[in-house]
């Protein structure tokens, strides 16, 4: 099917609005993507005519809601090519998924003297949970350093592994630099040393197909809201053998088999023992609609369109004086930059006056900011609904800011 950005844009109501009297150019999808009508309508329809508490209900609404929820689990498993839908846990998002692994698998498998490997480009969500785990148990956190071009110093990776390495936790795509890491070779190396691998896929799944079986990762996690779905819902994939061994990290309803005041509690089987309490069923329904929407467009078609747009953007930005770009030439989704000596907040504020939405700040990646010795960066992110015209507006806006501020 031929990809039509105009048809895609027509599905996103917010893209028709104005900001400061100008058409909105939304270049902040890496923070959170906008939602198509199909997602909004699916969630609204569920709340209007199909809502009920899931699991254990014998009435029609409950049974139908449960079936819809579990069908989304199946759809998500197909989306990332998991072996089974029962390898997927519904979580609030990438952050909760990583914390679940750290508190369940991590508490059971990482001991004093062990080590965990991360990289210098990680989002705080893939740093802080491991720092907390290491502090709890007396383990060491090791870091793959960056190159100036935004790639990792992969030649150092073999020196970081040893017999005490329990986990490599690595981002699929950097949320600041757009760097796509060579997961296949990194995962192979980790497994050769007996370590497990967690992949933060928050910035990858919307840009091209992901196949967790081909990657052979042990854990893969992503959020719905960056994938054109609702907030407050995400997916944690865990290889089935690992998942069945992991203890729950939250207690409550839905995750138990039996509860006795005298004999204690037993857990239900995975993945449901990791889904304590009433789930975000409306969000799950919306996520299912988002997966259906993206799959119908075709991730390969989306990838081709977005890569052409990225190449155009990088070439056009060369015309902006005093613009510093961060990251490699080959990248996915994001362009981080600074303009001269001006603070990112000032540049972002001027762009907002022109109707252009970009993200400013440290992007939850303070160690990366420290590496580049800057307090903040601007970040423009390109999604499937962005256009060449919007790129031109960004370039013109930056040129105008340079003329105004010098």
Swiss-Prot record:
It catalyses: (sulfur carrier)-H + L-cysteine = (sulfur carrier)-SH + L-alanine; L-selenocysteine + AH2 = hydrogenselenide + L-alanine + A + H(+). It is found in: Cytoplasm. Disulfide bonds: none annotated. GO terms for biological process: cysteine metabolic process. Pathway: Cofactor biosynthesis; iron-sulfur cluster biosynthesis. GO terms for molecular function: cysteine desulfurase activity; pyridoxal phosphate binding; selenocysteine lyase activity. Pfam families: Aminotran_5 (PF00266). Its EC number is 2.8.1.7, 4.4.1.16. InterPro entries: Aminotrans_V_dom (IPR000192), Aminotrans_V_PyrdxlP_BS (IPR020578), Cys_dSase_SufS (IPR010970), PyrdxlP-dep_Trfase (IPR015424), PyrdxlP-dep_Trfase_major (IPR015421), PyrdxlP-dep_Trfase_small (IPR015422). Cysteine desulfurases mobilize the sulfur from L-cysteine to yield L-alanine, an essential step in sulfur metabolism for biosynthesis of a variety of sulfur-containing biomolecules. Component of the suf operon, which is activated and required under specific conditions such as oxidative stress and iron limitation. Acts as a potent selenocysteine lyase in vitro, that mobilizes selenium from L-selenocysteine. Selenocysteine lyase activity is however unsure in vivo. Homodimer. Interacts with SufE and the SufBCD complex composed of SufB, SufC and SufD. The interaction with SufE is required to mediate the direct transfer of the sulfur atom from the S-sulfanylcysteine. Belongs to the class-V pyridoxal-phosphate-dependent aminotransferase family. Csd subfamily. This is Cysteine desulfurase. It comes from Escherichia coli (strain SE11). The gene is sufS.
